[in-house]
Structure formats: C-alpha cells, structure tokens
Amino acid sequence: MRFSVVTVIILGMLLRFPAAASDILTQKVDQIFSVYDKPGSPGCSLGVIRDGNFVYRKAYGLATLELGVPLSPQSVFYMGSVSKQFTAASLVLAAEQGYLSLDDDVRKYIPELPDYGHVVTLREMIHQTSGFRDFYTLLGLSGHDPADFNSPEETFKIVVRQRGLNNIPGDEWIYSNTNYFLLGIVVKRATKKSLAEFAAENIFTPLGMSHTLFYDDHTVVVASRVAAYDSGPHDSFHVDWSTTFELVGAGGLMSTVDDLLLWDGNFYANRLGKGTLVQELQTPGVLNNGNKISYAMGLDLGNYRGLPIVEHGGALFGYRTELLRFPEQKFSVICLCNIASAVPENLARKVADIYLSDKLQPGASALNPPSNESFPDPATFAGKYLDRRTHLMYSFTASNGNLMAWGAVLIRINANQFYDLGSDVITFEPSKGVIHAKLDLKGETYFSGSRVEELHLGEPVLASYTGQFQSTELGTVYSLSVEKGTLTLRNGGNPPQDLTPIAKDEFDAGDLGRLVFERDSGGRVLGFRVFTQDARGVGFKKED
C-alpha cells in the first residue's frame, strides 16, 4: 500500500497529538508542585491513576535533607489517618473469617473499658459514632505533647480511665482516633495476631503491596523510609518526625505511591475476602435517628464539583497524605508529602481539576467568588461563636475581603453561606440583632452557636475560680490563679494559658478548649469540665 507524503504527515501529526496533549497536562501538574521541586526542599510523591494504571507518577523534592536523597514513587511514607481504611478492612475480613461481629460490644474484647451505661459496638467505632474521646486530645490536656507520645501501653491507660463519652453511641458523628486505636487492639485479641500481622497476611501480601506495613515495632528497619520536616525561618526547615512512634490502628501505616496503586485497583476488582469488602468499606454509617452520614469505614464520601468522591487524608508530625478517588471516572490521585506546610487535599484536587476538566462542574473559588454587590461584607460575620450544648467555639476573621477560619479562606456560596475544601458548609443567620452560625458536617448539623462577646470580670470575681483542680481521668492537676487581672491556668512545666470569660461560669482556654465551672447550691465552685471538639466533659475536681 502506498501513502502520499501528505498522508504520512497527517498520520505523524495524529500520532504526536496524544503525546503533546499529555505533555501539556503534566506540565500543568508540575507547575502545581514547583514549590517543592528545588534543591534542599522536602516535597511530595504523586501518582495519577486512570483505569487502573498510572497516567503520571513523579516525585518532587527530597526524602531526607540530611543525605540529599530524592523522593520517588517507591519512597515509604508514614500515612497518618489514611491507615484507618486498612484497619477497617482488617475488621471486615476478620468478621468474614468468624473471629468477630461488627455489631459486637467492644467490651467483649476490651473488658478494661468501663461501663458507660450504653453499649458501644465495633461498627459504631468504625463509623466514628461511638462517643469515645480522642486520645491525642486527652494526652494534650494531660500535659503531654501528643505527637511525641509513643507508648501504646500508656495511651491505653488514659483511654480506659475515661468515665464518660462525648455522646450517646450512634447519636452523633465525632471523629476520634481512639476508635481506631482500640479497633487495632480488637483485631489482635480476636484473631490472636497483631494488626500488623493480620493486615500483612490478608491485605498487603495478597495484593502484592510489598513495601506496605503497620509499623508497630520502632526497632524495625524500613528501607526507603522518608523523613519529615516543618518550615523554619528564612526558607529553612527543621526535623518533624519520630523514630520511636509505634501506635497503630488510627495511624501507623507506611506505604508508597506504587503500592497504593494496587490498593486503589482493588476497589474496582476486589481480590480480598469473600467479595463484599469494597461494598462494606464504602457503605455510609447510620445514626440512631436513621440518618446516613458521609463517613463510611475509614473513608469520607463526598462530592467535588459535581462528581462523587471517596477520600481520606492523614497528618502527623510533618507527614501529610491524601488518597482521592473519583469512582465513576475510575480516576484517583495519590499525594504523599513530607513537609508539614503541604495540604495534599488541595493539591490532589488541583490535579483532578486538570485531568477531569471536561467532567467537573464550574465552582466558585476563594479567588473567584460569586459576584453580588448586595452580599453582606464578610466582616459582618467575623467573631467568636459558642454552641451552648456542646461548648464548642469557632472563630471567624475577615481579611482582604474574605472570611477565614481554621487558617484558610472560606469560599462563598451565597449571601450567608460559605464552605471550606473539607465540604463543611457554614450558614450565618442574623436574628434580632444576634448572628447565629450553623456548621453542617457529614450530613448533620455539627455546630449551632451564637456570636459571643468577651466578658469583663473584676479580680474579686475571678478569684472565686482559683485553686488546684485534679482530674483522675487525665491523671493531672491544673492550677488556676489571677495574674495581672487575668485568670491563668498552669499545668506542670507547660506554658501558662490565659482564660477568657465568654459566658456565665465559662472560659475559653484556647487550644485547651472551654472550661465550664460547676457550683454547689450555695454557689461555691466544686470543679469544672473541659470541652473540646473531640473530648467533651472531662472532669476536674477542686482540691480542698
């Protein structure tokens, strides 16, 4: 067969077009990560998956600054809370094998836990509706640096000392690392194998994930292990990781971009267990009132620019990780970083924006909000808002025409609604001169509070709150005194914390949460309870 010169040229151009289009996409991706692609910088390892194969995989930055070793798709990262989906999978597989039932009372396996007056099931723990207080928060309240607390035994002790729950099991969704820490123990006690052993035999080895493990022994050498860092002054970095951390269940997984390709593929062609694993992992939890939540089994179910997504991120020390899946498009992004300032949830979405541009709906962004001159100035909503039921408090600030919370710009939806990239929708409702704020999370109202103003109390009133207060649940003592007209809290050698009055007998303690004082019938202070986002009602009693 003969081809004319023109035909040959046209065929050549057609053959080159796909490659050229691919080059354009990858150049756009490289631009997203260019901040890390420079000498002497930590960075990220990236995998972009379509139809079960990588369409792009690349690493930016160094795995260890000390040795100058570059990151690669084979670099082994600490995965943080991405671990939870693997712990959940271990529970499902253990149930299939007859070792346990997901509807069992957790005290069947961990009788050291107290009787809370309500049964807590393994299923409620998997879906984060159990009510268990978060152990990282408890460790912080007790005066420890939770990120550097490495002992499973000591962590277990503080968990079983708790005499209360955040909520009636099944009533609310409250994210708590305690759930998955305890589930790791359940696997060990039910199967007689550690979580590391069970997951290796039932997940990692069958899928060929040869560089993935639950790191429960800090003496084990892990080849190609990545160090982690945080940013310092003048473009410097400092070490932000631990060589002795060995808590597993809530975290503890180590893996690579290449191995996670195999895990991602299993969601489309399951090779584990009896065939129902993938369906169970992606089934949303159900509250006692019958409402479904958008948290499944260690996986967040959501929507991004009109497309369903399944995802989970992780963060501990300087490690930041994200697995983002678009199941209908069979498209996923794996983004693993070793610098604390990275936000892989955002980075993964930006990559998806490039590859799925023809399928994603247009959406407002922080840089391109809906324009309407009649919208109230965002500064109208700035301030502190207190939920009187849960004693949660959120602060919103205005900056450069934007409303901000949690250190990020909120994206405007309409006149009174905003959201962040975690899909939390915040609604502000002015009523009778008072502004109310409502935050919807996982399909439920998570926060409902009114804006509060700082109270001004004189020293004689503040003096009534002073003294030594002991918590048997935390094994610690808080000392409260009036210093320069301010009620101040001290706990061991930690920096003092000023307390700000925000309501009757209630003080804001910054990162320590809110202190709500309790009095007897004569008005004498008996003690207080501490309320944080994931540890509510921790008790302190005033010492005589």
Where are these regions (language model features)?
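Short, small/polar residue-rich loop motifs at catalytic or cofactor-binding pockets
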Residues: 40-43, 317-320, 390, 474, ...
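Peripheral terminal and inter-domain segments
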Residues: 19-21, 349-544
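Short, well-ordered beta-strand elements
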Residues: 311, 322-339, 435-439, 526-530
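Active-site SXXK
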Residues: 33, 46, 52, 76-103, ...
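Short, surface-exposed loop or secondary-structure junction motifs
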Residues: 64, 117-327
